[in-house]
Amino acid sequence: MKTSKASQRYRSIRRNASQCYLYQDSLLLGNSDDSFNADETGDSSDPEQIFQNIQFQKDLMANIRCRPWTMGQKLRALRRAKEIVLKFEGRLTRTRGYQAAGAELWRKFARLACNFVVIFIPWEMRIKKIESHFGSGVASYFIFLRWLFGINIVLTVMTGAFVVLPELIAGQPFGSTASKTIPREQITSAQDLDTVWSLGGYLQYSVLFYGYYGRERRIGRAGYRLPLAYFLVGMAVFAYSFIVLLKRMAKNSRTSLASASNENYTFCWRVFCAWDYLIGNPEAAESKTAAILNSIREAILEEQEKKKNKNMAVTVCLRIIANILVLLSLAGSIYLIYFVVDRSQKLEQSKKELTLWEKNEVSVVVSLVTMLAPSAFDLIAALEMYHPRTTLRFQLARVLVLYLGNLYSLIIALLDKVNSMNIEEAATKNITSHWADAPTFSATRTVPEEGQWPTPGSGAELRRNTSTWVVEETSFLTSITPHTKANKTVPYMQGPQGQCWETYVGQEMLKLSVIDMLFTVASILLIDFFRGLFVRYLSDYWCWDLESKFPEYGEFKIAENVLHLVYNQGMIWMGAFFSPCLPAFNVLKLIGLMYLRSWAVLTCNVPHQQVFRASRSNNFYLAMLLFMLFLCMLPTIFAIVHYKPSLNCGPFSGQEKIYDIVSETIENDFPTWFHAVVGHISSPVVILPAVLLLFMLIYYLQSIARSLKLSSQQLRMQIQNARSEDKKKVAQMVEALAIPSDARQAGSATEAESSENSKPKTLQARIQTHEESSKRLLKDSDLISQLSSVYMATSPNNGHMLNFDSLSSKSLRMEAITRSLPQSPGQGSRDPCSPLLDGSRSRPEQDTNRHPHRPCSSTSNLHKNRSCSSVTQTQPLKDVRSEPLSRKDFQPISPPFCGSGVSTLMTHDHSPRAPRYYVVNERDSHKKTHRAFWPERHFKIDALGDIVELYPRNVQQYMSWVPNQPCSPQLSEEEEEMLRRDLVQWSIPASSLTDLPRSSCFYTGDRSENNTRDPKYQRRVYYRSGDNSFEDQLERPTFVHRKPRSRNGQYPQHALKARVKAKFEPSFTESDSVSAASSSDHQNSNNDQYLHVMSSQGRFPRSASQLGRRKAKSRQVLPTDLNDLICSNV
């Protein structure tokens, strides 16, 4: 028979796949030696075959690890695949080969470049080693330190390239101006230890501090504007820090959103998939092992914290007490720092010379408070019983508040001193102007013979009283002048030297940073190193175990150390404007801190008892750093805006405000129109709407962020639900594989018992859903779920109904239409509502019990007792097929009707027959209709007298109606032959069938005229009762049964399997599989009913008005809703 294009393509694919499989076996699994020649494999003149072989070899090389072969077979296969690709790929195109080679070369180069770049990442291997032994929480501290190191490198480059180097290269040299010259009274003590320690002497008059830089607007030949650069760089330090922090936080937020909030299969991933098989170094293997163990400990702790039960009343009370203690500690530290700063100011006013402790007591007290208070907070946090990660965050917040309180108390005290210095400077300026207006005295003397004489002069000393300033002349002979200068008139004008408050603030910030570094080194050596030595070497000689009890080995305190970095960076931001070299000093400090801390951790510290996983993004650290940056920027901005710059030092001397340098530069160095534009932009008319617009934009973006966060949570929940549904489906599949065998056994036992006790009296028409491919599911989803009741219009059966249901394929629910026969005397009857699963899962050999042996016995009350059985299908019905059962022992009553279109078995028109119900699948006229569930049938009578069904030419196989089941098992061969003759002779009188109800037949098909046959061409078969009491024309209903599971796919009762082409399969829907049996009176036997199944997008049936809009056809259509169908003459 002629096959279709799809069949040809399928066979071609199967043939190519088998050839490819044979080629794989011969190439990959063949045991050949090294003398393998690539010319013997894949050598062909066909370009398509060459391309297929090359493509296969590439796929093999890409998926060689997934092959279930030994390593030797994999290596041989990989070697041969490379040889074939290198040899034959050039036959197709050399450009593709060059591209592939270039891509491979670039991939190798990129990998080498990445490995080379890793070498330049500072302290990468050191951090990995720490992470493997101490966990990600401790490693996060060092990663954070490295990131701060990078920020300070950039800040150092900015200040050094634009401020420090131009001043050193093009500025005035040291000693040329008063701001760059050490006073004479300080020269002798400029190199003393206490002077250097207090950052005085030569350090004070150097590029380290603000006062050294000159006030010239342009320096050098290029006319570099140093004052403007100094101001812009100071603002750029804050701007760059803000931008970097926000970008890093946004990147970490995206990373944390991309990853799942809670990990699935945590322990499985860590146990089975955590090892890195590329490790070749024993030390790296040891570190990786420690890292895996530590991650498992972290996961175990996470699970334990989820299941921990707490007494909330006691916990709340302890937390309240802990917070009260923390507040008292914070208030006490702030008061102590402010008291020390105020005391130092009073000492400076009362004493001329201060001791070393009095000069540095402020920095020492601040460092002691910042070092001891976090330990007290750590002890207090033990009362709260939080999760370790939550405890860390509370500890970080408290220490942050402590550090901010210390810094602000220090800066407030410093600004108070700046106010007093400005008052003194204003008073000094007034006195200097008074001396400038006074007359100039001159003294003339004869030169003595000794060659020298004392020069008259005046020394002035300022003394502050309550309301006036008094100048007292103490002496007039202050120095000895050589006689060569004796006869000159020397004018004298001298006032008190002004002080530079910007340099003083920079000195205090740098001094605080230096002392903090020293205290950090001392705490590491004392608390960690010497403590570890004491515990290790004296534990054997002590009264108790020093390793498990006090003092034991030190633990790395993450919160304290992280906040120490934040505090240190805050000092840098606060003092960078007054000390341009402070970021460079911080770079050196961070380098030393990295090496010292890492050494102490690996040598002296032990892992924390409660190891916990650090946050994925570390945004909490960055948020604290951002908060610190904002609060440290405020004092600097306040000083720039509020205080007047010093008169005798700095690049802004002579200005009313520091920011006036910008307006002065715009006025003098830019065109007039630019100055006008800047003036309009800086006016309140523009600034206020811009600020409002920014607030609106921030609110809009925040709303979008909230909505995106909510949507991401919903999507994550959907993913989790999908995973749970997949798990349920897998469980159902496992149960479905286990159920059929048990169901078959139970069904066979039930059927055997029923056959022994009683004969079945129930004719059932079962409707089973069919689960098809995904494309078919999309089409089936459009088929509505219809439910109707057919009321029998015969006089004794009004009100009785047959229910049949057509459900969508997504619901595994079936409706069984049953008709119960009356019980014979002395026989039991089966339950008419018996479950469908028992019958559908029975073996094909046991189908004799499913169909009645005597369908026509005692049929006078056949129409009674109808019921509907609703059964839920619990397993997928992928192998369900509806086929007509074979019928035996009946002959055609007339020769086949010969026609061009239809040839069926039929009877004379005058004989009464039962009404037929055609279940028609209604489709639109513009859609292409498919064939019905079964193709149009053609019958003939073979030589043996059996009915043979002929399929059309496009059907690949025939199905012969061979004897399957005897109508009456009590008949012998002679009686069967007699039955055949009686059926042919038309020996049944019509009057004997008056009380016999006819069986209603349900047919499936499309509305199209060429697919639905006329009722008069339908097959008619005569039956005779078992006891020969009557004979009649009856239509046995078509049964839908489950396809048996067999390896060869053949039914045991059929000689040939009915194979229909795949293009007929899409027409198999729920509505097409309906077949049922019903009864009617002989008065209504000449009318056939059509049940239309409408295909629509909705879930509910169409109304009668919608059905009436369809085009009327040549047959009779029920115009009402399916729930009101009446089986009567319409």
Curated annotation (Swiss-Prot):
Keywords tagged on the record: Glycoprotein, Membrane, Transmembrane, Transmembrane helix
Free-text function comment from the UniProt entry: Probable component of an ion channel. Molecular function hasn't been characterized yet.
List of glycosylated residues: N264
Expression sites by tissue: Detected in most neuronal organs and also in some non-neuronal tissues.
PANTHER family: TRANSMEMBRANE CHANNEL-LIKE PROTEIN 3 (PTHR23302:SF35), TRANSMEMBRANE CHANNEL-RELATED (PTHR23302)
Bilayer-crossing regions: 149-169, 193-213, 226-246, 320-340, 362-382, 394-414, 510-530, 571-591, 620-640, 681-701
Cytoplasmic side: 1-148, 214-225, 341-361, 415-509, 592-619, 702-1130
Similarity field: Belongs to the TMC family.
InterPro entries attached to this UniProt entry: TMC (IPR038900), TMC_dom (IPR012496)
Cellular localization per UniProt: Membrane
Pfam families recorded: TMC
GO CC annotation terms, alphabetical: plasma membrane
Bias kind Polar residues: ranges: 747-767, 856-876, 1097-1106
Start-end of Basic and acidic residues biased regions: 840-850, 878-890, 1006-1017
Extracellular side: 170-192, 247-319, 383-393, 531-570, 641-680
Residue ranges, annotated region (Disordered): 742-774, 819-893, 999-1019, 1033-1059, 1097-1116
Top-level lineage group: Eukaryota
Protein name according to UniProt: Transmembrane channel-like protein 3
Membrane topology according to the record: Multi-pass membrane protein
Chain segments annotated as coiled-coil in the UniProt record: none
Broad class of the protein's primary localization: membrane
